[in-house]
A protein has these predicted regions:
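Conserved nucleotide-sugar donor-binding catalytic segment
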Residues: 2-81
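Anionic, Ser/Thr-rich low-complexity intrinsically disordered regions
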Residues: 23, 101-117
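Conserved short hydrophobic patches within well-ordered secondary structure
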Residues: 36, 68, 87, 110-111
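Short alpha-helix boundary/capping motifs
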Residues: 58-59, 79-80, 96, 115, ...
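Short, hydrophobic secondary-structure boundary micro-motifs
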Residues: 60, 103-104, 125
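Catalytic core of nucleotide-sugar-dependent glycosyltransferases
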Residues: 68, 76-100
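Terminal low-complexity segments of carbohydrate-biosynthetic enzymes
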Residues: 112-133
């Protein structure tokens, strides 16, 4: 994960910049950004996007704080048309907020489509061999 804001902002254009299970925040800042909204699968990424758009500063610690176990179900949940529609809606919101350009919106939608519509075993390989490097 990127540590500094200068790295977090460009990373957030295409991927969730924080590991939610390790996030600490000021409650009032979250409320000022609109709190968590109903945004299936992507509630945290939606909130971080709105907070970034409002100028809140983020920082990721370099230490690994949690080792999370995954199962095949994780890769199955992250696929399908409904998941893609939510990602497309998030990209639209990010574009409206000024976090991403039209080109980044299109690129993000294409990448999300590829990830969500591939078979689960390929999605697992992509996460393990490409996205977790």
């Amino acid at each position: 994960m990127p540590r500094l804001m200068e790295d977090i902002l460009p990373y957030a254009r295409y991927r969730n910049p924080l590991n939610h299970m390790t996030v600490m925040f000021r409650k009032q800042d979250v409320l000022n950004a609109g709190n968590y909204r109903h945004f299936p699968y992507l509630e945290d990424y939606d909130l971080w996007s709105r907070m970034l758009a409002k100028g809140y500063a983020f920082y990721n610690l370099p230490e690994i704080l949690v080792k999370a176990r995954t199962s095949e179900a994780l890769y199955e949940r992250r696929g399908g048309a409904a998941y893609f529609r939510q990602y497309r809606q998030l990209r639209k919101e990010q574009h409206t907020l000024g976090l991403i350009s039209g080109k980044e919106y299109a690129t993000g939608c294409i990448l999300s489509f590829g990830m969500t519509m591939q078979p689960s075993f390929l999605r697992k390989l992509t996460y393990q061999k490409v996205l977790r490097k």
